[in-house]
Amino acid sequence: METFNFSVPQDITVGKGSLSKLPEIAKKLGGKHALIISGPHLEKMGLVKKAADYLASVDIKADTFTDIEANPSVTTVEKATAKYLESGADFIVAFGGGSPMDVAKAVGVVAKYGGSVTDYEGAHKVPGPIVPLIAIPTTAGTGSEVTAFSVITDHSRNYKLTVFSYEILPKYAILDAELITTAPASVAAACGIDAFIHAEEAYVSTAASPFSDALAEKAMAHIGKNIRRFVANRNDIEAAEAMMTGSLFAGIAFSFARLGNVHAMSHPVSAFFDVPHGVANAVLLPVIAEYNALADHGKYLTIYNDISPIPAYADEFEPMMLVDAIRELCTDIGIPENLTIAINNASKTGTVTKEEIESKIEPMAVDAMKSGNIAVNPRASRQCDIEMLYRRAL
């Protein structure tokens, strides 16, 4: 066994109705004034006000910032940072899906150390602790409440930059399954499959360890056996709890084992065409699972048995059975059949032709190759391989 290390330095509260613990946790943090960073959907539903009211119950003031898009931009981080500084807040509550989480982490850095989020792009460029952060996810998907990553879109480059630093891990996380029951089916599907891919890619990563494998296996079992049920009925609290727990385990797993070609390739798709992150991942997954099958050394069987209604045994299993099972799962939960459909579904300017998409394949592949996730994908990949995979996904 190779040497590996791990540290999970966060305080995580899990349980139905645990949003009510926010005042207690904020007091523990020592905060007097919060900026709640969330999204417009939660604001309309009254959940942002509910969080603010919880804080007010212990005399903690709360301002809000909810102007956040699906793939948050450098400009959004600048606006949210300005709101934080103007408000006089001394801690942040990240309340929502992956987008508010990413923005909150970036604001925590820039508000503390100045400059632009682009100054912290890459690994370990955050000089020290950031503004204290409480993370409250409302989707079972990103795992961002337990990861050391913030992903922000730089439209000047059509590029999704990543800030990677253990300094940006939220100090506290609250996982309340009641909060994810409000998600539309399409969001539940995209976020749920994203969480599954976090676990799957961490599991087959060349950087995987016994620790990350244990978490990834548990995550895949929780998500794979409940995602169809949860997408069908978001009020199924038992399925919601399983999805949220699975997302948590997957987030910790990939924090240590990294990801792979799916995430490396999906970020450029979102940057160039504004496809939601989870959808881009899901469309690419079967194509890359087929590509990686050559490198499988037994883990595909475990993954298959987590998502297939009919279990298989080692003596009858073929890796392509997993690829077929992934396609079946994606179809069942309403994921677009291919990248062309996903891009057109996301388009705000009319039809995007296959030729237009193909013209972006080379620059997307160039950007994908910049991702550190390529290096831990189980099958080695060159730029020409990435271009080929994009074409297969069309």
Regions found by a protein language model. Give the residues of each.
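Active-site segments that bind and position negatively charged phosphate/pyrophosphate groups
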Residues: A202-E328
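C-terminal charged capping/lid subdomain of soluble metabolic enzymes
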Residues: I310-L394
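Short glycine/serine/threonine-rich phosphate/pyrophosphate-binding segments
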Residues: L19-L22, K44-L47, V74-T75, S99-K105, ...
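A glycine/threonine-rich phosphate-anchoring loop and its flanking beta-alpha core
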Residues: K112-A208, K299-T302, D306
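Glycine-rich phosphate/diphosphate-binding loops that line cofactor/substrate pockets in enzymes
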Residues: S20-L35, Y54-V58, E86
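N-terminal amphipathic/basic leader segments beginning at the initiator methionine
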Residues: M1-L29
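N-terminal small/polar loop signature for handling phosphorylated ligands or for N-terminal nucleophile
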Residues: E43-G115, R229-A240
